[in-house]
Amino acid sequence: MKAFVFPGQGSQFVGMGKDLYDNNEKAKELFEKANEILGFRITDIMFEGTDEELTQTKVTQPAVFLHSVISALCLGEDFAPAMVAGHSLGELSALVAAGALGFEDGVKLVSARAIAMQKACEAAPGTMAAVIGLPDEKIEEICTEVSTDGNIVVAANYNCPGQLVISGNVDAINAACEKLKADGAKRALPLKVGGAFHSPLMQPAKEELEKAIKATTFSEPKCPVYQNVDAQPHTDPAEIQANLIAQLTSSVRWTASVQNMIKAGADDFTECGPGKALQGMIGRIDKTVSAHGII
């Protein structure tokens, strides 16, 4: 069974989507429509901007979303998944590709999400760190140990066995990284991200995004969407909306999502969007399935 998966922030690169824009009339129309909705020419930054411009949250999120969604929509009849999932931001891409959300509404929501998250990052500076080589339970335990009332760190992204991303206040992340390394982590490295995504520090962004999501019409998707907050398949529009709101302050349960998709019959995963991050994760979750980019 075919599954399509959609990457999140961090997969962006300057030049992304340019081939699509130059060689596909439908893609060009959709990119131009997005420029219009966003109120600035995001394609200029995507195709020939600087890394610094592209890594601003308010730019990165719409850029990755557009590259992913437009890649899927331009496949036409070849886009026929039995199920879909997206990693963090990629969940919005998956919902548009699966027809739960219209393209224009998706662009508006991804812009609202990015702006709300950037504001939350500026109000409560935080960061994230990738931890390699310790069991999830041990990492969770250390996060709890080093957290205090005003200085928290939580498990944010369960990416694949042996790789977990933690998120929180800068001091708490640094303290956790020291302790994790002392306790045997192969690596505990702070990431170059704008803030503490998928942690309680995103609460103001969640409240802001909730209004935008509730004001948007969602439809039943053409296939089940495995959502980050519970790693379960969803087709009910109200459930999808609630999970999308909860996602900003909840962990991304990617390992469990992929495992559950495989249990449901998925054996051929196509990553739709920039980079190969999800292909690598899927390979580490289960070596018996196929994971590739768009062929």
Regions found by a protein language model. Name each.
Residues M1-I139, L191, D268-I295:
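FabD-like malonyl-/acyl-CoA
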Residues K26, T249-R253:
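Soluble or luminal CAZymes and related metallo-dependent hydrolases
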Residues T60-P62, A196, S251:
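Glycine-rich phosphate/pyrophosphate-binding beta-alpha loops
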Residues V252-N260:
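A short, well-structured juxtamembrane/interface segment
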